[in-house]
A protein has these predicted regions:
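Beta-propeller domains
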Residues: 1-483
Length: 483
């Protein structure tokens, strides 16, 4: 049996060094400030870690097994727990004591015994709906977890309601209606153009299902919703199965193709879809979408080129780095040409956009994101005010980095943006992590409280906040103070 040894890939050095361990820490130390009394609930986070080295030198950061994290806030204290999501893939590799899966999402590069195996890693985000907690990755079905222990319950099709082969890692849980809006892309298998939109009611029962075809089989990492429309952007990061079968990348950048946006009726069917198109571009994450009369605005961290340079053109030619900027894309429902209007909102590079979740799909003022404008590798948490055009930021310090933030309302009916941001921070020079709590309306003032972790929590992708009463009742207690 070969020794376990990771490659010299920079991905596995420094902060990216695999953790490969599960942790339980009760009563984390609060090294600054005090935990707000109203913070009662759990911050769930999900990310990738490496169970075994792949033996390749071209691994990418979005691959790896799901490592699920939770920060539980209870009576002024915070506890931390992390657990592997024991997917079918994880269990196969555990039994084999080595990596069995090759290039990202390319089963033709797997070990022979894993060629036809389920490849889902459940490594991207956390979803809580109708009393159930899930770990998600967009090329597979959800995995249900115990919300208290994080032990894996198992892969699920939600009682037969998921009819596609895949399920998004960016669902939208509306905390006002308690509806779940989700989708599947390449829904009939690798390289298919099929996409499926799902609407589930507050009890987890499927209320609508709409199938249609994309212009090309591509990566659809995120989408957005309004009160009447579901917004699907299609960017030319395309799957060519001939390339995949030859051992190449699952996605390839095809700038000769156009960008397309489909507006799908939230409560209708495929006959009501509206189509728009523009030049080749890309985006990983949507901040929000809003309907304004006959127009639909999509606010997105927009790249004027390829957002995933590790998925180059089919000839392997490198694509130049292009920074993402907060941009508003507008679709006019009365337009005859289907053009997309583009308007940059902020001249500062940013990613991982979030909002006050109560205002997803509704008129809103505040957007939160990671801001990149330092030359020392550090990053900041930002709040953009759409009304004033101003940016408020919190910086953790030289060389330190922030992860995606999570907004928590101060009260169930507090005004939009009145609450806290929970922000995981990488204390790079110390080799450990913090969780900082910020006043969402005054980031520049610094943390309300800082919770110290005595360990390094490898960077996670996305997460969600679940109030304590929601874990027991299955329903969110929120109300809209104003729209």
């Amino acid at each position: 049996m070969e020794p376990v040894r990771f490659s010299e890939n920079a991905l596995f050095k420094g902060w990216g060094q695999p953790m490969r361990t599960e942790s339980t820490i009760e009563g984390l130390e609060v090294i600054q400030g005090e935990i707000p009394e109203a913070l009662e609930g759990t911050l769930y986070r999900n990310g990738a870690d490496w169970q075994y080295p792949s033996g390749r030198d071209d691994d990418i950061f979005i691959d790896g097994e799901g490592m699920f994290h939770m920060f539980r806030f209870e009576q002024g204290q915070v506890s931390y727990r992390s657990r592997w999501v024991t997917t079918e893939r994880y269990k196969m590799q555990k039994d084999a004591k080595r990596a069995l899966f090759g290039r990202y999402r390319n089963r033709y590069t797997n070990a022979p015994e894993a060629r036809d195996a389920n490849m889902g890693t459940a490594n991207t985000t956390a979803m809580f709906h109708a009393g159930h907690l899930y770990a998600l990755k967009e090329d597979d079905h959800p995995y249900e977890l115990d919300p208290d222990t994080l032990e894996t319950i198992g892969r699920t099709d939600m009682n037969g309601q998921i009819t596609a082969q895949t399920f998004t890692a960016h669902p939208k849980v509306d905390p006002i209606t308690n509806e779940l809006l989700a989708f599947a892309y390449q829904a009939k298998g690798d390289g298919s153009k099929d996409i499926c939109f799902y609407l589930f009611d507050k009890d987890g029962k499927k209320a609508n299902e709409v199938w249609f075809e994309m212009p090309y089989p591509c990566c659809v990492h995120d989408f957005a919703v309004t009160d009447e429309w579901i917004v699907f952007p299609f960017f030319p990061l395309i799957t060519d199965m001939d390339v995949v079968k030859a051992g190449g990348n699952y996605f390839q950048w095809r700038p000769e193709e156009e960008t397309h946006i489909a507006l799908v009726p939230r409560y209708g069917d495929a006959s009501g879809i509206k189509w728009f198109k523009g030049p080749a571009a890309s985006a990983g994450h949507m901040m929000n979408a809003v309907r304004e009369g006959d127009k639909v605005h999509l606010d997105v961290c927009f790249y004027e080129g390829n957002c995933f340079p590790f998925f180059p053109a089919p000839d392997g030619a490198e694509t130049p780095f292009v920074p993402p900027f907060l941009t508003r894309l507008t679709m006019d429902l009365t337009s005859n040409d289907g053009a997309i209007e583009k308007n940059r909102l902020l001249d500062v590079s940013c990613e991982m956009p979030r909002t006050d979740d109560r205002y997803q799909g509704r008129p809103y003022r505040h957007g939160f994101m990671i801001v990149y404008r330092s030359k020392d590798g550090s990053s900041s948490t930002g709040r953009f005010d759409f009304e004033t055009g101003t940016l408020d930021t919190y910086s953790p310090g030289p060389g330190d980095t922030v992860q995606e933030c999570q907004f928590v309302p101060r009260t169930p009916d507090s005004p939009e943006g009145d609450g806290w941001l929970l922000v995981p921070v990488a204390r790079v020079s110390e080799g450990r992590s913090d969780l900082v709590i910020l006043d969402a309306q005054n980031l520049a003032a610094g943390p309300v409280a800082t919770v110290k972790l005595p360990v390094r929590v490898r960077s996670t992708f996305h997460g969600t906040w679940v109030p304590a009463e929601t874990i027991s009742s299955g329903k969110y207690p929120y109300e809209l103070a104003e729209i």
